């Protein structure tokens, strides 16, 4: 098999354009036949050999396509380790090439992620590198489209907390709301239906994503079976969030201040709410930052990781301001 593969690979190295692609297809055919016979180890090693040969020849696209098809093939035969290894090589081909971030490439990466064992360490390493590459070297937290695709996969796996994190770094407020409705209905207490969306809205606003904050609130309150039609709402916290979104659009500090004072009983339900609101006051109402946080320890660390450090508050709204931020 190795001799046949190498002969096909040498043919692929000749010429250009369609002829090159024809050679790659012949290589794929030989490798597929080997995998179908169950020669997994030999096929895996040959994929790796061809990858490094293509890369050394500057054939980054061919290397990427071959590794992607190989990874899918190994996944289809439940060869998780080999598939994960080739998935990492797909990323390596992207990292070492001048390939631009494009939707089809993001979809390919999300597809590989969806096929990996959810509990494997390789998946954690893969998503970290994929997000870093998708940021285009900007130092941001990854492309919002990739975050959206990852969020959808994690939602299907009922990994709601991780799905929520990625939705918050996407621009898909509607998808986030639909996931939160399911999350709240299946895992939450009826008394906390308002808290699921309140946290999401406040964190979207801390990320300067007003549009998604508004969409997630409207969609969630319309679709959640335990929330009566509003506004106004039965739950005071939902009324606060509704007024807050209106106040953010208006930008009047006095309105924001009175609003926070009037709804303190509701805001005390979660000690992080006032910390988020301190940040929102800085971003949208010109409130100067506090010299020291009122919280230390775990809460202080959580808030600092949410807000990032040293970020520029004057950047554009939404994903244009995705400075290093972690959300629990």
From Swiss-Prot:
Cellular-component GO terms for this entry: BAT3 complex; chromosome; cytosol; nucleolus; nucleoplasm
Main localization (coarse): cytoplasm
Domain of life the protein comes from: Eukaryota
Keyword Chaperone: no
Cellular compartment(s): Cytoplasm, Cytosol
BP GO annotations: ERAD pathway; maintenance of unfolded protein; post-translational protein targeting to endoplasmic reticulum membrane; protein insertion into ER membrane; tail-anchored membrane protein insertion into ER membrane; ubiquitin-dependent protein catabolic process
GO molecular function terms listed in the Swiss-Prot or TrEMBL record: protein carrier chaperone; protein-folding chaperone binding
Biased composition (Acidic residues): 310-320
One Pfam family this sequence matches: GET4
Sorted UniProt keywords: Cytoplasm, Transport
SUPFAM superfamilies, per the entry: TPR-like
Recorded coiled-coil stretches: none
Region (Disordered) residue spans: 306-328
Function according to Swiss-Prot or TrEMBL: As part of a cytosolic protein quality control complex, the BAG6/BAT3 complex, maintains misfolded and hydrophobic patches-containing proteins in a soluble state and participates in their proper delivery to the endoplasmic reticulum or alternatively can promote their sorting to the proteasome where they undergo degradation. The BAG6/BAT3 complex is involved in the post-translational delivery of tail-anchored/type II transmembrane proteins to the endoplasmic reticulum membrane.
Subunit structure as annotated in this protein's UniProt entry: Component of the BAG6/BAT3 complex.
Family label: Belongs to the GET4 family.
Name of the featured protein: Golgi to ER traffic protein 4 homolog
UniProt organism field: Taeniopygia guttata
Organism taxonomic ancestry: Eukaryota, Metazoa, Chordata, Craniata, Vertebrata
């Amino acid at each position: 098999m190795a001799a046949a593969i190498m002969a096909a690979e040498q043919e692929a190295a000749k010429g250009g354009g369609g002829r090159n692609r024809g050679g790659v297809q012949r290589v794929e055919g030989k490798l597929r036949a080997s995998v179908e016979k169950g020669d997994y180890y030999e096929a895996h090693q040959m994929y790796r050999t061809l990858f490094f040969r293509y890369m050394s020849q500057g054939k980054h696209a061919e290397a990427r396509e071959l590794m992607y098809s190989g990874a899918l093939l190994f996944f289809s035969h439940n060869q998780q380790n080999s598939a994960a290894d080739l998935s990492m090589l797909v990323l390596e081909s992207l990292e070492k090439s001048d390939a631009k971030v494009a939707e089809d490439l993001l979809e390919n990466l999300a597809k590989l992620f969806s096929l990996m064992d959810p509990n494997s360490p390789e998946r954690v390493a893969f998503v970290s590198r994929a997000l870093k590459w998708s940021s285009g070297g900007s130092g941001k937290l990854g492309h919002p489209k990739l975050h959206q695709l990852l969020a959808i996969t994690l939602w299907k796996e009922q990994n709601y907390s991780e799905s929520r994190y990625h939705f918050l770094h996407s621009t898909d407020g509607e998808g986030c709301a639909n996931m939160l409705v399911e999350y709240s209905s299946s895992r939450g207490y009826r008394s906390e239906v308002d808290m699921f969306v309140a946290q999401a809205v406040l964190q979207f606003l801390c990320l300067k994503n007003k549009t998604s904050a508004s969409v997630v609130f409207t969609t969630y309150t319309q679709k959640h079976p335990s929330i009566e039609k509003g506004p106004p709402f039965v739950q005071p916290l939902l009324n606060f969030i509704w007024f807050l979104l209106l106040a953010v659009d208006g930008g009047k500090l006095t309105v924001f201040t009175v609003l926070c004072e009037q709804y303190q009983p509701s805001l005390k339900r979660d000690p992080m709410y006032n910390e988020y609101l301190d940040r929102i006051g800085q971003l949208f109402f010109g409130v100067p930052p506090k010299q020291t946080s009122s919280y230390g320890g775990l809460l202080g660390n959580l808030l600092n990781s949410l807000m990032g450090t040293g970020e520029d508050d004057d950047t554009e709204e939404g994903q244009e301001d995705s400075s290093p931020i972690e959300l629990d």
